[in-house]
């Protein structure tokens, strides 16, 4: 995905084969456009337990704080609920405080931290119930 290579937080973006592998089953891939692609969000049925895993997403820096990420997340959550998923799960890194704040503001809770050195690489697992 060419767009992911333009998101500065993604140090080493995944190759297309990884996207194909993860999206082999039930998935949702969204692209936001403002004359051109400016953001994306991809999720899939990773755990096969009624949860939907929000795997990857980002917005080009020039288009942040314009509601793009909010719109993508709203669509993903609505789609997941309509497709009988009960939870949205995501994993981020401690260094992505903007993503953590965005998720907390959307009603996610932190469920687990996987400590990694250096500390900013610590993985933060979050979830949001879709039944409310």
For the regions a language model picked out, list residue spans one by one.
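Conserved GNAT acetyl-CoA-binding A-motif
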Residues: 73, 80-92
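Conserved catalytic-core motifs of GNAT/GCN5-like acyltransferases
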Residues: 89-93, 104-125
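Short alpha-helical
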Residues: 49, 94-98
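Acetyl-CoA-dependent GNAT
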Residues: 1-56, 60, 73
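Conserved acetyl-CoA-binding loop-helix of GNAT-fold acetyltransferases
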Residues: 59, 65-78, 101, 105
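Short beta-strand-to-coil "C-cap" segments at the C-terminal boundary of structured domains/repeats
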Residues: 127-132
